[in-house]
Design a protein with these regions (language model features):
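A short SAM/SAH-binding and catalytic strip from SAM-dependent methyltransferases
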Residues: 87-98
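Feature marks short, surface-exposed loop/turn motifs that line or immediately flank catalytic pockets
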Residues: 60, 123-125, 171
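Short aromatic-enriched loop/helix-cap "lid" or pocket-rim segments at secondary-structure transitions
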Residues: 64-66, 126-131, 175-181
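Conserved N-terminal segment of class I S-adenosyl-L-methionine
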Residues: 1-80, 87, 101-104, 133, ...
Length: 254
């Protein structure tokens, strides 16, 4: 799915509306981590004098009040308290477990006042996995190597204060250990091969399997049936969680 189609989807518009309601702050400086096409960075130019748009590859956003920067959330090249506000959405789920705490510490370090974090909520990252045809490695959907709930996010930003939590969308997207094994055996034919993210093991692009045996096809049918049965009795859960954090001053910590 191209980025324009993604932005225009009803679920994405609902998510964007929630995030906009949390970005109520105004000030001089703002940092958008994982800026991509600049969708949120452009919106924040109405509230901040300067918006820094950061991504792993330098964003190409043409706006007089947006400064595009190539950078890594695990090693932000900014001084402490550099920004009045920091936005970080669709980022933390991609960060390796070993670097996740450091990334969150960096976000908290560079903000002066507030942070908004947006991630998938309790995502079952066993569902819709992919199998790399190059190396045979199994990948999580959309390159999401982490799953989050309120407790985990709050613990990762333990030095910040929770101001507000919002939940967006509903789904029943879950699987089970048996379906997972069957899908893996069948080559994960229904995985997220349309994703931009490459294989987390070898770095090559992910391509769907070109051929499967009759046994693999049967395995995927059984896995699908088990998933549908499971999802029919599951309670819906939110798709996204958004949290507005504020920075606690040193005096308030005492």
């Amino acid at each position: 799915m191209d980025i324009l189609t993604y932005r225009q989807s009803p679920s994405e518009q609902e998510r964007s509306k929630s995030l906009a309601s949390l970005i109520s702050a105004q000030g001089d400086t703002c940092l958008d981590i994982g800026a991509r096409d600049g969708f949120f960075a452009m919106q924040m130019t109405d509230r901040f004098s300067t918006v820094t748009a950061l991504d792993l590859e330098k964003p190409k956003i043409l706006h007089p009040n947006i400064e595009c920067v190539k950078g890594d959330v695990t090693d932000l090249q900014f001084a402490d308290n550099s920004f009045d506000f920091v936005l970080c959405v669709e980022v933390l789920e991609h960060i390796k477990e070993s670097l996740l705490e450091n990334a969150c510490n960096e976000i908290a370090r560079v903000t002066r006042n507030a942070v908004v974090i947006g991630v998938p909520y309790r995502q079952d990252i066993r569902l819709a996995r992919t199998t790399c045809v190059t190396c045979g490695g199994i990948n999580p959907p959309w390159g999401h190597v982490n799953s989050f709930d309120e407790k985990r996010l709050i613990s990762l930003f333990k030095d910040l204060h929770v101001e507000r939590i919002e939940y967006v969308g509903t789904c029943k997207d879950v699987t089970n250990w048996l379906s997972t094994k069957l899908y893996d055996y069948s080559g994960n034919p229904f995985g997220t091969y349309a994703q931009e993210e490459s294989c987390i093991h070898c770095g090559y692009s992910l391509l769907p399997p070109t051929s499967r045996s009759i046994f693999q096809r049967i395995a995927s049918i059984i896995a699908n049936t088990l998933n549908h049965l499971q999802q029919s009795i599951m309670r819906p859960r939110p798709i996204w969680i958004h949290i507005l954090f504020t920075k606690v001053s040193e005096l308030e910590k005492i």
